[in-house]
A protein has these predicted regions:
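Generic hydrophobic, amphipathic alpha-helix propensity
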Residues: 5-13, 30, 55-59, 63, ...
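Helix-turn-helix
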Residues: 8, 16-50, 54
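Short amphipathic alpha-helical elements of helix-turn-helix/winged-helix folds
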Residues: 12-16, 91, 158
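Short coil/turn segments at alpha/beta junctions that flank glycine-rich nucleotide-binding fingerprints
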Residues: 19-23, 74, 95, 139
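Hydrophobic alpha-helical connector segments
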Residues: 54, 68-95, 148, 152-155
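Amphipathic alpha-helical packing segments from all-alpha helical-bundle domains
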Residues: 64, 111-139, 149-156, 164, ...
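Amphipathic alpha-helical segments used for helix-helix packing
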Residues: 92-113
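Hydrophobic/aromatic-rich alpha-helical bundle segments in the mid-to-C-terminal region
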Residues: 99-104, 137-182
Length: 192
């Protein structure tokens, strides 16, 4: 049975991971940042894997909450997609340090479907974008794609990875990075 991580532990876990990286974020360091002891975590059955799963759930919640307004907004698919992609940039910015500190394997465990499942980003992250792509194809403000799920995966990764790189690797402001990735992403999906 998987242990449930007390939500009060997560901010400390994030700090420990951001300070030390996933590989060196021991339970002792996580406990110290969370203001508790390693033994308390141990008694509660909290493992690093349980913490990673709780962080994944937290990120799912963040993305879902950020994309909900674009899903329910009036307007064309293109206008709603722009709103959704801006929201992806905001969430990416809120998690810059965490994403950098996690490393590939833990980050992949959070975001990717198993390779045997088509190699896509997990649907919890991409379904809102896919829905808007379908709506935009229906109202003809966006191109129709043969595989909207795959296109949503491409957009999610294009925005997330490029935005993070421009912010951390090039030192761009959030506004400049958002403007840069959105102009190219939207141009690629807008109908002519």
């Amino acid at each position: 049975m998987a242990s449930v991580v007390d939500p009060r532990i997560l901010p400390g876990a994030r700090r420990a991971i951001e300070l030390h990286g996933w590989q060196d974020a021991t339970l002792e360091r996580i406990a110290a940042e969370a203001g508790t002891s390693r033994m308390t975590l141990h008694r509660r059955g909290i493992t690093r894997e349980a913490i990673l799963a709780a962080l994944a759930t937290s990120l799912e919640d963040q993305y879902r909450d950020a994309l909900w307004p674009a899903l329910t907004a009036p307007g064309t698919g293109r206008a709603r997609l722009e709103q959704a992609l801006e929201a992806l940039c905001v969430v990416a910015d809120e998690n810059l340090a965490l994403m950098a500190a996690l490393g590939d394997r833990p980050r992949d465990a959070i975001f990717h479907e198993p390779p045997g499942d088509g190699g896509l980003t997990r649907a919890t992250f991409t379904e809102p974008v896919e829905r808007i792509l379908r709506d935009g194809a229906a109202d003809e403000s966006l191109r129709a794609f043969e595989d909207p799920a795959e296109t949503a995966t491409v957009l999610f990764n294009l925005i997330g990875w490029t935005y993070r790189h421009l912010r951390t690797g090039h030192g761009w402001t959030p506004e400049r990075a958002t403007r840069g990735v959105l102009s190219i992403a939207l141009e690629g999906v807008t109908s002519s």
